[in-house]
């Protein structure tokens, strides 16, 4: 028996003895082949030649089996189960948040070719059976699109929330919109008008009102500057005038009763309408662009036979506007 065989047997029994041979040892001793060995002349690791200077040794590199022994003085770690290393495809995953527009539009690819590469995961509807109604704002498609009517195009296209075509008007018939188009916006008149009051309200005691879009509601009868009883007189009886003596501004105090109040026939149209034109809509648009709300217009035909219009006179509201400006 030669000395080399004896030395190998002793080395296997005593791992603490250093190895003086130049041959590669496949021992599991910490001194010769462990990753925590302090010897710098260890040539048993194949990755020692490829190790760069200053590069730290990773615990998950250099072993084909994927397991690295712990450092000296520490118990070996229990191997992790394979289910943690590679999760199974049947494991539950986080469900993505569904969009508010999910299945609210038809899939173009499915409509053209009859198939879709995403299948059941497609965010669009495959047929009318999967099509859903999106949750819309209560005023969706109830107002005109200013960009479409002023510029002739809209960057939002079919997804715009405003009306591009008359067929898109989704307003309920018989119910006027609460929020209407403002006439003072770029001079664009609105095509819709508020429905007239019921016939039961058009009596001699309640005056008939004419509104334009974005106008304020009529004031209560108690707030009217002229009592409704003045309109219930006989057609030939002259209307009694009273001195209002308003105390709101100096110009109103200087105004005489004749310059403030005229006959009933003169109230058929506001005095400023003569300076604006003969079209009532033109007067309504100018009034809304000036003050934001329109002044009421009395209709003389309700209270008796029409009378010839008197000379144009200014109402107190226009005196206040001229003073404030």
UniProtKB/Swiss-Prot annotation:
Keyword S-adenosyl-L-methionine: no
Region described as Necessary for nuclear export: spans on this chain: 1-15
Modified sites of kind Phosphothreonine: 90
Annotated region (Necessary for localization of ARE-containing mRNAs to processing bodies (PBs)), positions in chain: 1-172, 98-325
Chain positions found as Phosphoserine: 58, 64, 86, 88, 91, 167, 184, 195, 216, 227, 275, 295, 322
Necessary and sufficient for the association with mRNA decay enzymes and mRNA decay activation, as annotated region: 1-98
UniProt subcellular location: Nucleus; Cytoplasm; Cytoplasmic granule; Cytoplasm, P-body
Region: Necessary for nuclear localization, residue numbers: 93-166
InterPro entries assigned to the protein according to its UniProt record, in alphabetical order: ZFP36-like, Znf_CCCH, Znf_CCCH_sf
GO CC field: cytoplasm; cytoplasmic stress granule; nucleus; P-body; ribonucleoprotein complex
Gene Ontology MF: a single term: zinc ion binding
Zn finger residue spans: C3H1-type: 101-129, 139-167
Regions of compositional bias (Low complexity) in chain numbering: 15-48, 75-101, 204-214, 285-295
Keywords for this protein: Cytoplasm, Developmental protein, DNA-binding, Exosome, Metal-binding, mRNA transport, Nucleus, Phosphoprotein, Repeat, Ribonucleoprotein, Transport, Ubl conjugation, Zinc, Zinc-finger
Highest taxon in the source lineage: Eukaryota
Region listing for Necessary for interaction with PABPN1, in residue ranges: 101-192
Region (Disordered): 15-101, 185-248, 260-325
SMART domains attached to this UniProt entry: ZnF_C3H1
Entry-linked Pfam families: zf-CCCH
Region entry Interaction with CNOT1, spans: 311-325
Post-translational modifications reported in the UniProt record: Phosphorylated. Phosphorylation at serine and/or threonine residues occurs in a p38 MAPK- and MAPKAPK2-dependent manner. Phosphorylated by MAPKAPK2 at Ser-58 and Ser-184; phosphorylation increases its stability and cytoplasmic localization, promotes binding to 14-3-3 adapter proteins and inhibits the recruitment of cytoplasmic CCR4-NOT and PAN2-PAN3 deadenylase complexes to the mRNA decay machinery, thereby inhibiting ZFP36-induced ARE-containing mRNA deadenylation and decay processes. Phosphorylation by MAPKAPK2 does not impair ARE-containing RNA-binding. Ubiquitinated; pyruvate kinase (PKM)-dependent ubiquitination leads to proteasomal degradation through a p38 MAPK signaling pathway.
Transmembrane feature ranges: none
Purpose: Zinc-finger RNA-binding protein that destabilizes numerous cytoplasmic AU-rich element (ARE)-containing mRNA transcripts by promoting their poly(A) tail removal or deadenylation, and hence provide a mechanism for attenuating protein synthesis. Acts as an 3'-untranslated region (UTR) ARE mRNA-binding adapter protein to communicate signaling events to the mRNA decay machinery. Recruits deadenylase CNOT7 (and probably the CCR4-NOT complex) via association with CNOT1, and hence promotes ARE-mediated mRNA deadenylation.
Free-text note regarding domains: The C3H1-type zinc finger domains are necessary for ARE-binding activity.
Protein name in the entry: mRNA decay activator protein ZFP36
Organism: Ovis aries
Gene that specifies this protein: ZFP36
């Amino acid at each position: 028996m030669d000395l080399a065989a004896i030395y190998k047997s002793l080395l296997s029994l005593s791992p603490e003895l250093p190895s003086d041979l130049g041959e590669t040892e496949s021992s599991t001793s910490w001194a010769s082949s462990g990753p925590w060995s302090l010897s710098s002349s260890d040539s048993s690791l194949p990755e020692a030649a490829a190790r760069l200077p200053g590069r730290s040794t990773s615990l998950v590199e250099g072993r084909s089996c994927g397991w690295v022994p712990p450092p000296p003085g520490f118990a070996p770690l229990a191997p992790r189960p394979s289910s943690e290393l590679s999760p199974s495809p049947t494991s539950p995953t986080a469900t993505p948040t569904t969009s508010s527009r999910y299945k609210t539009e038809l899939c173009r690819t499915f409509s053209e070719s009859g198939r879709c590469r995403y299948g059941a995961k497609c965010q669009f509807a495959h047929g009318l059976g999967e099509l859903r109604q999106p949750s819309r704002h209560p005023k969706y498609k109830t107002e005109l699109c200013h960009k479409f009517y002023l510029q002739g195009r809209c960057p939002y296209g079919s997804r715009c929330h405003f009306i591009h075509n008359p067929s898109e008007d989704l307003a309920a018939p018989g119910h006027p919109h609460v929020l209407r188009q403002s006439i003072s916006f770029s001079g664009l008149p609105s095509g819709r008008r508020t429905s007239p009051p019921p016939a039961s309200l058009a009596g001699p005691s309640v005056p008939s009102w004419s509104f334009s879009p974005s106008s304020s509601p009529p004031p209560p009868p108690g707030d009217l500057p002229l009592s409704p009883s003045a309109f219930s007189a006989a057609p030939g009886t002259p209307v009694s005038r009273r001195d209002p003596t308003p105390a709101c501004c100096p110009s109103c105090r200087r105004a005489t009763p004749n310059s403030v109040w005229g006959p009933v026939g003169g109230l058929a149209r506001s005095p400023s309408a003569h300076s604006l034109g003969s079209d009532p809509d033109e007067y309504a648009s100018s009034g809304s662009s000036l003050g934001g709300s329109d002044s009421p217009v009395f209709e003389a035909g309700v209270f008796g036979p029409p009378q010839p219009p008197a000379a144009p006179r200014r109402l107190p509201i226009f005196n206040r506007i001229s003073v404030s400006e």
